[in-house]
């Protein structure tokens, strides 16, 4: 028997330099089911298609009892494939599950499913040097049928993958201008993303569905980002619709300081946590605290940060109700900009271009299921 090459090389026929953020047909997805009798999740299984058959009266479809995650895998110069900080996503996924009464997926099951999804679709991991990645979307939901507002007994955990470009690569600016000046941001003022003591700090669809129309409307006007303020006072920065907020201050002695929000209504960002660690390694200060909107004009650089977006420089922030228009004149493409230094360091670790001194990446080894397919093909 001749074993299939692993990792498989990038699939021919895909234009890796011009990916978007839309689904691509891959080999399949992963499923694990929760047993109400044993109170355990099953061993993750590879399903060779993208479809799920469920009852139309599940609490997931009717009452929003569902959660999701997002992380990425990269192909490295050595030829291996790695996933970036999946353990942190596992912890966040479990926290989201508890928030909507879904049995938390154990970390080992989560990691096994993620590694299996990537390994069984290794030819869809983009080549080195394209800036693209394999986006990984874990999701879980109540799958048993019930019309009444009662706890479900059955649940399904899935992991999907798709090759993608950075989320805001095509956000109204041409690529050259986006890298140099950043994207425009608009403050959302007719809608509160999350309520105090609500679900803003977990990844549930209800936090995102109502924002979709506003994101699209802003995009039609040339804004690549929409920014949310706190729902209680509307005076504090919460986060962008798709990612977290980072501001950079330059103190009188030219000391650099990254400022991130400590709001209890936002999702804990793995990307922001990583960027803050990198900044500390550069000797820069990091503050996690409330950010008044009035302070936004005092920052010398501003970014949106998240798994899908990675790190996106912001050109301007506009708040129409007050007529405020805050513009940042920095050349983000300049290698000495704070953005350029952080982006290079983060992408370097993710793509295996620099040593991973933090132990953030996990190599995806050859799945046992792939070996089984080789055996079947040989017989």
UniProtKB/Swiss-Prot annotation:
UniProt biotechnology annotation: Due to their effectiveness as antifungal agents, echinocandin derivatives can be used for the treatment of human invasive candidiasis.
Provide the GO biological process annotations. Answer: branched-chain amino acid metabolic process
Query: Which annotated residues bind pyridoxal 5'-phosphate?
Result: 92, 239
On this chain, the residues bearing N6-(pyridoxal phosphate)lysine are: 203
**Which terms in the Gene Ontology molecular function aspect does this entry carry?**
branched-chain-amino-acid transaminase activity
The record ties this protein, via Pfam families, to: Aminotran_4
Indicate the enzyme's highest-level EC class.
transferase
Identify the InterPro entries for this entry: Aminotrans_IV, Aminotransferase-like, B_amino_transII, BCAT-like_C, BCAT-like_N
Q: Does the keyword Ligase apply?
A: no
Segments crossing the lipid bilayer: none
Superkingdom field: Eukaryota
Which pathway does UniProt place it in?
Antifungal biosynthesis
List required co-factors.
pyridoxal 5'-phosphate
Q: Which UniProt keywords apply?
A: Aminotransferase, Pyridoxal phosphate, Transferase
Query: EC annotation?
Result: 2.6.1.-
Which PANTHER family does UniProt cross-reference here? AMINO ACID AMINOTRANSFERASE, BRANCHED-CHAIN-AMINO-ACID AMINOTRANSFERASE 3, CHLOROPLASTIC-RELATED
Q: Describe the task this protein carries out.
A: Transaminase; part of the gene cluster that mediates the de novo generation of L-homotyrosine from acetyl-CoA and 4-hydroxyphenyl-pyruvate. L-homotyrosine is a building block of echinocandin B, a fungal lipidated cyclic hexapeptide that acts as an antifungal agent. This is followed by isomerization of 2-(4-hydroxy-benzyl)-malate to 3-(4-hydroxybenzyl)-malate by htyD.
The UniProt family comment states: Belongs to the class-IV pyridoxal-phosphate-dependent aminotransferase family.
* Protein name as catalogued: Transaminase htyB
Q: Which organism is it from?
A: Aspergillus rugulosus (Emericella rugulosa)
Q: Which gene encodes it?
A: htyB
């Amino acid at each position: 028997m001749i074993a299939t090459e692993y990792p498989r090389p990038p699939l021919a026929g895909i234009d890796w330099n011009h990916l978007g953020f839309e689904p691509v047909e891959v080999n399949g997805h992963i499923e694990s089911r929760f047993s109400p009798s044993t109170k355990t999740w099953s061993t993750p299984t590879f399903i060779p298609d993208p479809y799920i058959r469920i009852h139309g009266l599940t609490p997931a479809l009717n009452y929003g009892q569902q959660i999701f995650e997002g992380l990425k895998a990269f192909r490295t110069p050595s030829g291996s494939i790695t996933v970036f900080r999946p353990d942190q996503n596992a912890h966040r996924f479990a926290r989201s599950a508890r928030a909507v009464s879904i049995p938390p997926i154990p970390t080992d099951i989560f990691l096994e499913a993620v590694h299996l999804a990537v390994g069984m679709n290794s030819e869809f991991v983009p080549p080195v040097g394209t800036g693209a990645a394999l986006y990984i979307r874990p999701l879980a939901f109540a799958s048993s049928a019930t019309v009444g507002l009662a706890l479900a007994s059955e649940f399904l955990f899935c992991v999907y993958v798709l090759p993608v470009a950075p989320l805001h690569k095509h956000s109204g600016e041409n690529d050259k201008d986006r890298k140099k000046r950043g994207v425009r941001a608009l403050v959302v003022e007719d809608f509160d993303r999350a309520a105090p003591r609500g679900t803003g700090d977990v990844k549930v669809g209800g936090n995102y569905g109502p924002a979709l129309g506003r994101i699209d409307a802003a995009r039609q006007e040339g804004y690549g980002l929409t920014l949310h303020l706190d729902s209680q006072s509307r005076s504090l920065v919460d986060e962008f619709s798709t990612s977290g907020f980072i501001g950079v201050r330059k103190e009188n002695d030219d000391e650099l300081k990254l400022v991130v929000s400590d709001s209890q209504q936002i999702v804990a960002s793995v990307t922001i946590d990583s960027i803050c660690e990198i900044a500390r390694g550069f000797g820069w200060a990091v503050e996690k605290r409330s950010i008044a909107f009035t302070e936004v004009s005092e920052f010398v650089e501003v970014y949106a940060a998240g798994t899908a977006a990675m790190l996106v420089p912001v050109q301007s922030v506009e708040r129409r109700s007050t007529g405020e228009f805050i513009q940042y004149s920095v050349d983000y493409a300049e290698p000495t900009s704070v953005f350029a230094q952080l982006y290079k360091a983060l992408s370097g670790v993710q793509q295996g271009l620099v040593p991973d001194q933090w132990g953030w990446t996990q190599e995806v080894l050859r799945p046992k299921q792939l070996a089984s397919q080789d055996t079947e093909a040989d017989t």
